[in-house]
Every structure is written in structure tokens, then in C-alpha cells.
Amino acid sequence: PLNIGGIQGVCIFTGLPVPEIAKGAFGLERHEQEGLFELSRLCIRPDTQQTEYNITSWFVARCIKRLRRETKVRAIISYADSDYHNGTIYRACNFRYCGLSDRKKDFYFADGTKHSRGSIKGEEGEWRDRTQKHRYVMVFDKSLDLLWSDKSSVLSSD
């Protein structure tokens, strides 16, 4: 955590949530995914962002440096929700932009709740488009072959 007179921000790295991400990004099988991380949560207090110039990129860079010091990091993947932003902070931290995630749909029951898992046969509801995410990757292991193409030139600013 970022602690300047109290916690100002948090950056959380997790293992990849599903093995298919590493398969799509690097062609890696389930048993080859050690050292791959997702920057899954990043939060900085808004008042801190307004008073401290470049605090978010500074903080993310320090967190990545610490993670690499404490464990083997081959690559970090992160996503920016296209409904809210396009990932300016990741570009500022030298992540490579790799386009949008695949289009997907989720099933919503008639009462408006989202279906999580299992069969929906015979259920009333509708399929809704899921928001696509901007994909960002930072590769440290030069032996990894990034299969997602670099799309930096096609991304407009926030």
C-alpha cells in the first residue's frame, strides 16, 4: 500500500484468473504459467491524485519493482474497462497495449440477476454484451512470445 500519513492507495497483483489468458497471450499451457501475474486492482485516493503529480505511475512502478524483487515475474497483464477509461496509467508505466478483449455475452435472468455458472436451458432472460476491456502487457521474460499484437498506434487518448 501507499502510505503517506495513512493509506493513500493499493496495488494488487494476483495469479491469472483463468489459464486461457496465458494460452491466448503467450501460447502457454497450464503447467507453464508460473511467474505470470495480473495487476488486478489499483486504487489511489482521488485527493492524493490531485495533489501529488504522477503519483499513480510512480506508485505502480514501485509496486512492480517490489514484486520483482520478491518473486519471479515473467509478465504482468492488466485490463482497463472500456466503459470508464482506456488505460492511460498503463501506457505511462510502459505496458504494451494489445487491443480489446474478445467480445463476450452474459446471460441475465428475467429478474435482472446475472447468471454465474451452469445450464440456462428453459430459463427466461436475455443475453447482454459484456464490456470489452483494453489489454495491457509488460513482459520481463524475453523467452515469452507475445501472441497478442501491439496496437499502441491505434489507441486514442482518454
Question: What function would you assign to each model-found segment?
Answer:
Residues T14-R128, R135-M138:
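Acyl-donor binding region in acyl/amide transferases
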Residues P1-G5, R130-K133, V139:
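Amide-forming acyltransferase catalytic core, primarily the GNAT-like/NAT-type
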Residues W148-D158:
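Short, cationic low-complexity segments
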Residues P1-V18:
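Conserved beta-hairpin
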Residues R135-W148:
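C-terminal accessory regions of radical SAM enzymes
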